[in-house]
C-alpha cells in the first residue's frame, strides 16, 4: 500500500515538473514572438500556454499539503527558464547590428565580409593610437556567431559590440527581407 502512494506521489511530482517546464518554455517563446511583433503566433502560443499553466497550478493547489509538489513546481519553473533561453537561442529571430573597430586600419576587411554576404558600411575612425577601421554590419541573428568568428579571424583584437535594431528602412537588406 505504501509503495502505491510513493509511486503515485513520484508520478505527481514528475507531471508537475514537466508541466511547468513546458509552461515556462511556452511563456518565453510567446514573449519572443510578442517582442518580434508576430502577434498571431504569440496569441496561438498564449492559448496553449494558459491551458498548461492552469493544469500545473491546479495540480499544486489541489495538493497543497504535499510540499514536494510545490518544490517540483518551483524546480520546473527554473528548468523552464533555462529551456526557454535555449529555445530562444535556437530560434534566433530578428537581426543585429554589429559595430566593429579594428586594432589596425585594414581596408580589405569590409570587402572580405561583403564577399561572405554581409552588408558592411565602413569608414576611417581615429582612436588614441591612430587610425582604425570602423564598420557597421547588419546581419540575421542566426548568422551572428559566424560573423563574430569571421571578424575574430580577420582581426583577433577587434572591438565588437552589437545591438538589436527595432526597425530599419532602405539599404542592402531591404531587398532580401520578407516581412
Curated annotation (Swiss-Prot):
InterPro entries, per database record: DUF2179, DUF5698, UPF0316
Membrane-topology descriptor: Multi-pass membrane protein
CDD domains with a match to the protein in the record: YitT_C_like_1
Transmembrane segments: 9-29, 41-61, 67-87
Pfam families named among the record's database cross-references: DUF2179, DUF5698
Family the UniProt entry places it in: Belongs to the UPF0316 family.
Protein name: UPF0316 protein BH0621
